[in-house]
Curated annotation (Swiss-Prot):
Keywords: Cell membrane, Decarboxylase, Lipid biosynthesis, Lipid metabolism, Lyase, Membrane, Phospholipid biosynthesis, Phospholipid metabolism, Pyruvate, Zymogen. The record marks G170, S171 as: Cleavage (non-hydrolytic). It comes from Methanosarcina barkeri (strain Fusaro / DSM 804). This is Putative archaetidylserine decarboxylase proenzyme. GO terms for biological process: phospholipid biosynthetic process. The lineage of its organism: Archaea, Methanobacteriati, Methanobacteriota, Stenosarchaea group, Methanomicrobia. Its cofactor is pyruvate. It is found in: Cell membrane. The gene is asd.
Length: 203
């Protein structure tokens, strides 16, 4: 399955590949043939990047799940920071069930998403009102990622694990954890959106 909104990108890449392939044959040009192979490789990369595999999500109000694929690069108090590498799936999912109370988009720079200065980067924040209080899911663009996509709207009722948006080409997602939960992931741990449990309800 391909991510929602990927069609224009893939159509353009496929069209360019086909165009250079036809031109290289028509003009018998080895140079254009090489360009066609490069375009084909880029198209393959785009398909790999925009993949969005189906995942069976076990919905529960006793734990929170990761909103993104990637690696936990920092835990700051009640906030977990997850860095998504280029090879990761870049579709983001709701860590908890609730209602989207607010969505705030801010323009900004494009510093590496793992840097502290990336707090000034382009970002999109979801405030999900859950039974345990508000949960913030912050999408942060990186040096390559320059387009944040939102699949959800204010007042949408969302289920844990539901797709809420994506960031193109490498980025970071921060999620806040309510005080009713205990954070169980550690810095350096790899996580999967909709699958990895990142916090459990306190007993």
């Amino acid at each position: 399955m391909l991510a929602k909104g990927s069609e224009p990108w893939l159509f353009t890449a496929t069209f360019i590949t086909a165009l250079f392939a036809v031109l290289s044959r028509a003009m018998n040009s080895s140079h254009l043939n090489h360009v066609a192979y490069i375009a084909m490789a880029m198209t393959f990369f785009m398909v790999l990047f925009f993949r969005d595999p189906e995942r069976k999500v076990e919905v529960s109000d006793t734990y929170m799940i990761s909103p993104a694929d990637g690696t936990v690069i920092d835990i700051r108090g009640r906030k977990i920071c997850i860095f998504m590498f280029l090879q990761n799936v870049h579709v983001n999912r709701a860590p908890i069930s609730g209602k989207i109370r607010e969505i705030t988009y801010k323009k900004g720079g494009y510093l590496p998403a793992f840097c502290k200065d990336s707090e000034r980067n382009e970002r999109n924040e979801f405030i999900i009102h859950s039974k345990y209080g508000d949960v913030s899911v912050m999408q942060i663009a990186g040096t390559i990622a320059r387009r944040i996509v939102s699949y959800s709207r204010v007042n949408d009722n969302i289920e844990q694990g539901q797709r809420i948006g994506m960031i193109r080409l490498g980025s970071r997602v921060d999620v806040t954890i309510p005080h009713d939960f205990e954070i169980i992931v550690r810095k350096g741990e790899r996580v999967l959106a909709g699958k990895t449990i990142i916090a459990t309800i306190k007993k």
